Each structure stands twice: as structure tokens, then as C-alpha cells.
Amino acid sequence: MKVSRYVFVIASVFSVMTANAAQKGEGYFGVSLGQATVDDFCGGGESSCDDSAISLRIHGGNQLSSFANLEFGYRYISDVETAGTINGIGVAAAVNGHFIDTTLQLGMPETGPFKVFTKAGVLLWRLNYDVAASNGFQTFSASDSDSGVGFRTGLGATYEVSEGVRLRADWDFLVNVGSEDELGETDINVFTVGPEFLF
């Protein structure tokens, strides 16, 4: 219920921000694709483990001033997977995630085609877990999900390639994602690149 309220508040603020951007001509939206790496997902005792996955993010924002932006985004991170054997039983697990975030960005220089920026914000995360176990005769599988609130920070850069279009690269650090009741809390490093469109 608390997460649903957060989603409602973020959606409301985003709609107001978009309307304001449309009036002032200071808005932008973009899409980025890259790789996410989950810290401490692989412990070393697995027969196979992949702690990296594809990350896709869609975002939109409003320029508050010549050096500050307010931005909202949705990110999907595909499966990270691990498999191993425990007491003769084969076990496999996969986790993917959905993230909604709101972020304040501060960048410099204030003018020119190239800008670097830092960022800080909050995010709502939802992780989906799939687990399977087999003794060679029978297979058991289960699915679960969990949600919560975390933080995000990072660095980025944009370059205006033409009027109304710029190329953007980001490093995002997602903090305190996950629950101790499931696989535990972790941090996620994400590197992405993609186009951004001004309006």
C-alpha cells in the first residue's frame, strides 16, 4: 500500500512537470540501453552465475534552471541467474526488476553542447524471483516478488548532436535494492547510453 501511494505521487508530479515543460519548452525525454551488474549476487560456490543483465530505461524531465533538472524514469533490468547444487539437489534462481525513480540532476557548464552532471534521487523497486530445484526425479519451482524504496545516484554526460537531439551516457548506482527476507539487500551499477529529445 505504501509503494502504491509513492507511485501515485510520482505519477502526479510527473504529469504536472510535463505540462509545465510543454508551456515553457524546457522539457526532454529519452531512452537508454546498457548493462546492469548486481553486487554480491555471485558468491563463488555456484556451478554457474551471471550477475549482469540488460537494462532499459525510459525517462523524461524538466529543466528547472540552466544547471538543474528534475527527472522521472522507468527502468527494467532483465534476469540475473545462478545455479548450483546443495546436498545433491540442483538449484537454480533468476531475478529481474522494475524501477520507478525521481531524480535531481546538477550539471555544468550552463551553456554549450557538452554537459556533465551528477544526480541523486529515490526509487521504487519491484523484484521478481523464480526458483527451481530438482533431485533428478522431481522438480519443484516457485515464484515470488518483493518491493520497496531505495536510493540512486551517479554521473552522466550529454552532447547536443543537433537542434533538439542530444546523446546521453549514464552511470547509475542503485542503493539498497532487495529485501533481507528474500536474497538480501544489494547495490546495482548500471551503465547506459541513448538518445534524448528536447521539446
Over which residues does each language-model region extend?
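Hydrophobic secondary-structure block in the mid-to-C-terminal portion of proteins
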Residues: 158-199
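Cleavable N-terminal export/targeting peptides
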Residues: 1-26
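Extracytoplasmic loops and strand-loop junctions of Gram-negative outer membrane beta-barrel proteins
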Residues: 41-44, 85-89, 136-141, 176-177
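Short, positively charged, low-complexity/disordered linker segments
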Residues: 138-166
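Gram-negative (and chloroplast) outer-membrane scaffold detector with strong preference
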Residues: 22-26, 33-39, 56-135, 188-199
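Hydrophobic alpha-helical segments of small multi-pass membrane proteins
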Residues: 100-102, 120-123, 149-157, 173
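Sequence contexts marking disulfide-bonded cysteines in secreted/extracellular proteins
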Residues: 41-43, 48-50, 111
